[in-house]
């Protein structure tokens, strides 16, 4: 029983330490990186360049998985694109 509690505790700690986020990556002006059908390879490369685990074209913009906390992603409520 103690071993099971220890295992669960370790897994929870790993989840906290290796926390990442998912979302639309943004350009310096705050706009999403645009893409078109068939450009998932390009989006995946852009996401990995930003230290994400992977990405794809979720038309009309690149969606990334596993981004570090310091990478800015699109936020609907704080949208600065075109302003």
Swiss-Prot record:
Subcellular localization, as worded in the UniProt entry: Secreted
Phylogenetic classification of the source organism: Eukaryota, Metazoa, Ecdysozoa, Arthropoda, Chelicerata
Modified residues (Cysteine amide): 81
Keywords per UniProt: Amidation, Disulfide bond, Ion channel impairing toxin, Neurotoxin, Secreted, Signal, Toxin, Voltage-gated sodium channel impairing toxin
Keyword flag Disulfide bond: yes
GO biological process assignments: defense response
Disulfide bonds: 31-81, 35-57, 43-62, 47-64
Annotated signal sequence range: 1-20
Protein family: Belongs to the long (4 C-C) scorpion toxin superfamily. Sodium channel inhibitor family. Beta subfamily.
Protein name per its UniProtKB record: Toxin TdNa3
Chief subcellular location: secreted
Highest taxon of source: Eukaryota
Domain LCN-type CS-alpha/beta: 21-82
Expression tissues: Expressed by the venom gland.
Free-text domain note: Has the structural arrangement of an alpha-helix connected to antiparallel beta-sheets by disulfide bonds (CS-alpha/beta).
């Amino acid at each position: 029983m103690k071993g099971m509690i220890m295992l669960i505790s370790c897994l929870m700690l790993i989840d906290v330490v290796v926390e990442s986020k998912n979302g639309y990556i943004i350009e310096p002006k705050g706009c999403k990186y645009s893409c078109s059908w068939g450009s998932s390879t390009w989006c995946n490369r852009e996401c990995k360049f930003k230290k994400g685990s992977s990405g794809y074209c979720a038309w009309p913009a690149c969606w990334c998985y596993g981004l570090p906390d310091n990478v800015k992603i699109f936020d609907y409520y704080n949208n600065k694109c075109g302003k």
